[in-house]
Amino acid sequence: MDRFMWTNGLLEMNETLVIQQRGVRLYDGEDKAKLDVGGVVLSTHRLLWRDQKNHECCICIPLSQVIFFEEQAAGIGKSAKIVIHLHPAPENKEPGPYQHSKYSYIKLSFKEHGQIEFYRRLTEEMTQKRWENTPVSQPIPTGTGPKAGRTRAVGIVGIERKLEEKRKETDKNISEAFEDLSKLMEKAKEMVELSRSIANKIKDKQGDITEDETIRFKSYLLSMGIANPVTRETHGSGTQYHIQLAKQLGDMLQAPLEERGGMMALTEVYCLVNRARGMELLSPEDLVNACKIFESLKLPLRLRVFDSGVMVVQLQSHSEEEMIASALDNVSDKGSLTAEEFAKLLGLSVLLAKERLLLAEKMGHLCRDDSVEGLRFYPNLF
């Protein structure tokens, strides 16, 4: 409450009334203020409160003093409140009803409702900050309250100087931001050229490039991303977009699929693709639609949906018979396997390992033991 100062309650030039509400009690933090119930007025520049009985008792606080605010729901026998957190009182603050306060926030208690609309309008004003764009052109005089103070002198020249300094600082920040952006674009071009050079070396096998180096180069390329991702801006939003996207996915995913045993969960594909696309993020719906037309475009990839609903992307050469045979061979060699153990053997995710084991079980090659220790698969000897 020590942030409030006395005022005559009149709006200044360039100051506009936003909303007012009667039946509002002030709280100094958690304590009721010594002032009675009154009306609260929100303008483009200030928050004012006038005593309901003694109209000469009027106080105000600039909106620039507000840090943030929040709603407090009504309870049994309690009115709804708006809690307003404030900056410390400035040294040159005009006199007000409180000289000192142990709280850094106030509460507006709405006895006659209206807090929802008031909160909405307060949110709008704090977002727009119109007091910065249209400063009052006259000093805000103090009123004739119980402790009326002197008239506060606000210089027009001082306000204009501050606005000019703020404008120059904003221009400087924008210029620095564009300089950083230009440098980033230059580096991006260098990275794209480097990625193309590495791709050509891998393709042509020029020079002394070992298999380990080839794998490392591929991982670097993947981390650097796609140089020219397919977007709706470049290919529209219809079928043509999904066709071009499917072709790009076919080129991008073939190498990662081969390294992961020929199959990847669609969620893993989604993360991999969006990480490579950088800022041009792909929606889950577009990814699914592109994957659905792999077969019609005769691409080397296929979208597969297991009985459990799990969706995966797999190589066309990755046949169901090979998956079943691999599961049966590994389970037979170990005697029995859980999905976690099978995943470690093949370097797959636990989800895909479980789907392979369930597929082999469905075809009659494996059987399960579902106990408190978990699901374990055995060779089907029957």
UniProtKB/Swiss-Prot annotation:
Residues in GLUE C-terminal domain copies: 105-138
Keyword Protein transport: yes
Coiled-coil stretches noted in the UniProt entry, renumbered to this chain: 160-193
Keyword check for Protein transport: yes
Gene Ontology cellular component list: endosome; ESCRT II complex; late endosome membrane
Record-level Gene Ontology MF annotations: phosphatidylinositol-3-phosphate binding; ubiquitin binding
Record-linked PROSITE patterns: GLUE
Any GO BP: protein transport to vacuole involved in ubiquitin-dependent protein catabolic process via the multivesicular body sorting pathway
Domain spans labelled GLUE N-terminal: 1-88
Compartments, as annotated in UniProt: Cytoplasm; Endosome
UniProt keyword list: Coiled coil, Cytoplasm, Endosome, Protein transport, Transport
Function field: Component of the ESCRT-II complex (endosomal sorting complex required for transport II), which is required for multivesicular body (MVB) formation and sorting of endosomal cargo proteins into MVBs. The MVB pathway mediates delivery of transmembrane proteins into the lumen of the lysosome for degradation. The ESCRT-II complex is probably involved in the recruitment of the ESCRT-III complex.
Binding partners and assembly: Component of the endosomal sorting complex required for transport II (ESCRT-II), composed of SNF8, VPS25 and VPS36.
Family: Belongs to the VPS36 family.
Protein name per Swiss-Prot or TrEMBL: Vacuolar protein-sorting-associated protein 36
Organism of derivation: Danio rerio (Zebrafish)
Phylogenetic lineage: Eukaryota, Metazoa, Chordata, Craniata, Vertebrata
